[in-house]
Amino acid sequence: MYTGIIEAVGTLSLIEKRGNGAFVKVMTPASFKAKERVKIGDSVASNGVCLTATTVGDDFFTADVSAETVAMTCFKFYKQGQRLNLELPCTPATHLGGHIVQGHVDGIGEIKDISPLGEAVNIWVSNPPELSRYIALKGSIAVDGASLTVNSVTDDSFRLTLIPHSQTVLAFENWQTGRKVNLEVDVLARYLERLVLGQKFQSNAEEKSSALSFETLMQNGFI
């Protein structure tokens, strides 16, 4: 489990196709202290994707990326030199500065517009329609692994505002109009839907439409 508070930005120095999956090598900055903090078998969130370290050096780690992960995430688009937001799993003593992030990408979004707002920037991101019901105004969403606040929503997109600090600590140089990004919705929204509706969803992508509404939440004592 992660918090979406990015610890460092690494660089994808190698991505090698292996069957339908891939093998990757990620270079890390000295401040990340890879060899000291990462052990073989540990998980490292890389642009929001949970990767298991297979080898670790002073300034790098390697990982195998499964065929499903390649298919379901932006790793299918990545090339050598791609910058990656990195975060190690939280512990019981970790300050939860963001929100609960699992490192399990729910879908791929696309940056539709970037516009300045003083020193900040507004970013509109389109999302797969099946995720819209989990994205709420002033709620949290993980974008490329970073816990960010939703400031506006439409039927198929949402707006983020990145303050100067966020632009500095994230792999913000990746974010351009048309760029694909990994999205993970707040897992609490998914659990709430299941608890309130008592509804079994299909395990595939063709989930039923949600009946979750403001009235349903009130009737079940959540509001």
Label each residue range with its predicted role.
Residues 1-223:
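Conserved loop->alpha-helix
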